[in-house]
Amino acid sequence: MQTPRASPPRPALLLLLLLLGGAHGLFPEEPPPLSVAPRDYLNHYPVFVGSGPGRLTPAEGADDLNIQRVLRVNRTLFIGDRDNLYRVELEPPTSTELRYQRKLTWRSNPSDINVCRMKGKQEGECRNFVKVLLLRDESTLFVCGSNAFNPVCANYSIDTLQPVGDNISGMARCPYDPKHANVALFSDGMLFTATVTDFLAIDAVIYRSLGDRPTLRTVKHDSKWFKEPYFVHAVEWGSHVYFFFREIAMEFNYLEKVVVSRVARVCKNDVGGSPRVLEKQWTSFLKARLNCSVPGDSHFYFNVLQAVTGVVSLGGRPVVLAVFSTPSNSIPGSAVCAFDLTQVAAVFEGRFREQKSPESIWTPVPEDQVPRPRPGCCAAPGMQYNASSALPDDILNFVKTHPLMDEAVPSLGHAPWILRTLMRHQLTRVAVDVGAGPWGNQTVVFLGSEAGTVLKFLVRPNASTSGTSGLSVFLEEFETYRPDRCGRPGGGETGQRLLSLELDAASGGLLAAFPRCVVRVPVARCQQYSGCMKNCIGSQDPYCGWAPDGSCIFLSPGTRAAFEQDVSGASTSGLGDCTGLLRASLSEDRAGLVSVNLLVTSSVAAFVVGAVVSGFSVGWFVGLRERRELARRKDKEAILAHGAGEAVLSVSRLGERRAQGPGGRGGGGGGGAGVPPEALLAPLMQNGWAKATLLQGGPHDLDSGLLPTPEQTPLPQKRLPTPHPHPHALGPRAWDHGHPLLPASASSSLLLLAPARAPEQPPAPGEPTPDGRLYAARPGRASHGDFPLTPHASPDRRRVVSAPTGPLDPASAADGLPRPWSPPPTGSLRRPLGPHAPPAATLRRTHTFNSGEARPGDRHRGCHARPGTDLAHLLPYGGADRTAPPVP
């Protein structure tokens, strides 16, 4: 027996295998954390929920906290709440409760609240939310509140929270709506803010006020400067202030809405332009795009900026770390990229980008078209122009129309330092400790998610930057949100949203702020490794070390105690065996997340399998329809084809076969001549004739006149305008005028019973036949009373109207009354039978021909009407195939 050969693999299967094989390379698995802190540790973390001295909980009936801003000044924490400002001491550390020592109540006055309500705002929105909380000098706090959509600012003593001086307007310094983002900082005694300046939040602005320099702002309502920005952070470095934000990119307007991350800078000493151009506006404002992407043939970008750290020194370079995420309607993912401010400054010295017309794309500006001195530089004494107001108009006009740089700011290593795509909640907050460990030489990054989960990473900036796997180590994952103290029934995820993550390096803790509480969490939980040297050293945590007494201790900077530690990740196989490290990630087990590899593999497999199944299904259905059509054509050909020569017999010539014997004309033997016509007609009838019914009147009584031909088309129906003039016309009991009357020629389309043997020669008209019947010559067939055989639509077809149905009782014809199917006397529809003929069969007619008045010249078919059997019900007029479509 021959062994069957294996069928070659299908192309779809090969494509599926290739895609599945490449998915692992494109989406590498991210390592889980080396350890996960038990959730019961949360019960030991100190929390602030508004408690004051002498009370463990807030007063009964007091409003819940609605924290907006948190500021740490040395060992004091200032918390900006709704209508309140708290001063909390972080020393001495407590393990149960954080309480305020001072409280400032700052409510909106009733008039501001009434105006706010009149503008359509809710009562809960017409409050004073603290949105700006800054240290102005060593003894003064600068605080701004929304004040019921009428922002106001004030100075307060840092020790007593007593007001210092008068209140000032908060316009362009504080947002109207507490939900709007804003940033602010003091530099050289001047306040730099980024917010919106109007009630509708349309006019976004970077604003400088206070100090000894004039007030400046960005150009108003210019999409080249700002397009729906969301301000994230601001830092001071050198002679500039840098603002980090995200906005809709105008240079990608051909791609609909594209959100990109930006960094903009202004000169501290900018005094504005001339009275002709950019008066009281920035002359040094420039912006560039931040590039945080995964390299490859096609870069995968993280465009949504979430958080930025202050300027830190890594390897002697000024660096900021920024958290980026994907858009909310994209694959969830977050990345941490580092940016060197020297590279940022170099980009601002590069090429500009412009759009020559509203319909054109953005292109680089040739260097020969850039005026000198270079636009965007800081004019200062000793330079060609000692002030920005002295700059020529061409330079000022160029700055006004060309604020965007052509190149993007690259991230350090041209790749993210940390990449997480397995998190259900995106990373939105970041804190960095560049002096971690007993020697202060390690860098630890804390990343906070929307739900309060914190991820701790050990970053090695000097390591190879070829990939993210060797650059960072996922040390630990722990929770910071205490639902028993920070939550309330019906609070949902809004109350769990992480507002800020502040590092308190002096006490070795993190300050996690939520809308209703502030939790202080230790940066490490070394005690969970006590009793197991392998776990303590294998954790690679720079905050933990193995002590000689057999415990895992916390190592603060400058620790002099003896300990063992290994942050390089060396093998711990020689350190004994004990309970393994906790590796069950909270983000995987508790949140029930799915691996990106599994997600991509499942999506690709579902697409390929669905495409293959759909293709086979469509092909099968199309083939089935073709096979049915082919079988139908073959059946019709087999019915109409007969004889040796496969000659086609026209149904309109079946009447000629009556005159032929079994052998054809003259008794000749023609192929198929002996086939009775009813046998050929039966398959064509759509209503399923019974053979016995066909043959009950004789096998050769089918008349060619009773089969309509395709050339014939019925005429439209006609109503009877007046009673029929014939004395035997239909009386009052006849059909109404909406039903057609039978024409005289309709008798040629009715099947009548006859004896088994037809006469060889028809008798003369009016003479009796051998069986006692009178023979009447048929008139020529008229097209207005016949139907075509096929139901195909044509412009000349007429609608077929159903006539009233009912049994035809021939016995009642003698009373002279019209019947539901009584023919007009001018054109008898039946052949009169002999006196001894059998009674006619009961007929129920469901369709009729279009009717008209009796035509002149119609002759009676017999001397008098006699009952006969009507076989009209054998024709498929009642079937669906015989119903003509409406005339369009």
UniProtKB/Swiss-Prot annotation:
Entry keyword annotation includes Glycoprotein: yes
Compositional bias ranges of the Low complexity kind: 706-717
Keyword Transcription listed: no
GO terms, biological process: axon guidance; central nervous system development; hippocampus development; neural crest cell migration; positive regulation of cell migration; semaphorin-plexin signaling pathway
Keywords on record: Cell membrane, Developmental protein, Differentiation, Disulfide bond, Epilepsy, Glycoprotein, Membrane, Methylation, Neurodegeneration, Neurogenesis, Signal, Transmembrane, Transmembrane helix
Region annotation (Disordered) ranges: 651-679, 695-742, 757-888
Residues bearing the modification Omega-N-methylarginine: 665
Compositionally biased tracts (Gly residues): 661-674
GO cellular component terms, A-Z: plasma membrane
Sema domain sequence ranges: 31-523
Disease / disorder: Epilepsy, progressive myoclonic 11: A form of progressive myoclonic epilepsy, a clinically and genetically heterogeneous group of disorders defined by the combination of action and reflex myoclonus, other types of epileptic seizures, and progressive neurodegeneration and neurocognitive impairment. EPM11 is an autosomal dominant form. Clinical features include normal or mildly delayed early development, developmental regression after seizures onset, inability to walk, severely impaired intellectual development, poor or absent speech, spasticity, ataxia, and intention tremor.
Protein family (similarity comment): Belongs to the semaphorin family.
Record's protein name: Semaphorin-6B
Organism expressing this protein natively: Homo sapiens (Human)
